[in-house]
Amino acid sequence: MNDSDRIKEKNENEILRRNFTKGSVKTILSISLLEHLCSTDLLAAKDKYTAKKWLHAVHEIGLGVKETKISQIQWQKQVEELFQNKIELNELLKLINFDQIEKSAKFVDNGARSIRPKLPRSNGYPKSLVFGSQVFALKKGRSVVPHGHNNMATAFIVLKGNFHGRHYDRISDEKDHMIIRPSIDDKFGPGQTSSISDEKDNVHWFKAEDEPAFIFNIHVLGLPNKKGPPRRTGRLYIDPEGEKLDNGLIRAPFIDSKKAHQKYG
C-alpha cells in the first residue's frame, strides 16, 4: 500500500468514526429525551380525557355498577383511575366551575359545607347522570365525620388543600355496633382520590389540615345489598374509637349525626 492509499484509508476511517459518534450521540439523546418525557408525564398527557369524554366515562361505569354489570370493587378501581389519571385537575376544576364555588362558599364552624356543582348537560355532555355530586368545603381542623354507607358507591378527589384521610373495611354489623378494620390511613393532597362501596373501604373520615380545603364527591345510590337483608340507602355514623378487638378489629358504636359532629366535626 502506497502513501496515497494509506492517507485515503485513514480519511475513510475518520469519516466512519465521526458518523458512528454522531449516530451514537443522536441515539443517546433520543433515549434521554424519551426518558425525560416519561418522567415528566408529557407522554402520559396524551392519555388524558377531555372533560366531556371523562364525564361520559364516569357516567358509563356508574351505569355498570348500578345495573350490576361490574362489581362494586371493579367500579372503585375504574373510578379512581378516571379521577386520578384520566383528567387534568385544572380541567375538572373548570368542569365544575370551581372558581365560583370557592368564591361563594360559606364555611361552617363544625363539619363540612356541602355545595352542589352544576355540571353541563348539553353540547354533547350526558343529558342525565346516574350519579349525584357535591363539593365539601372545610376549614382547617374540620372533618367529613366518620361514617359508613348502605347501598352506595362513592368516590372523592381533593380539589384544594390537604387532608388526613382514613378508611375502614366494614366487616359485620351488630345491633348497636359496626365491626370495622382500618384499611387506609394516609395524607391526601390535590388530585389524590379514594373510594368506598359496600364491599371495600366502606367507612371513611377526612380531616382538613389547612384551609380552605375542598373535596369533590360523586355517589351512585340504590345499589343492591348482597351481604344481607334489604337496608335503607344512606349514611351510618359511627365512633371509630370503639372497643379494640383481636386481629386489628374495632367494635364501633353507631351514633347519630349530632354526636358524630360534636366529637369529630
Tell where the protein language model's regions lie, with residue ranges.
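Conserved short histidine dyad/triad with adjacent acidic residue
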Residues: 134-149, 198-201
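A short, N-terminal "cap"/entry segment at the start of jelly-roll beta-barrel domains
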Residues: 46-130, 182-185, 244-265
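N-terminal secretory signal peptides
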Residues: 1-15
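N-terminal twin-arginine translocation
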Residues: 14-19, 30-50
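Asparagine-centered strand-capping/turn motif at beta-strand->loop junctions
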Residues: 205-208
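Short acidic-glycine-tyrosine-enriched beta hairpin
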Residues: 172-201
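A short hydrophobic beta-strand segment most commonly corresponding to one strand
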Residues: 155-157, 210-223
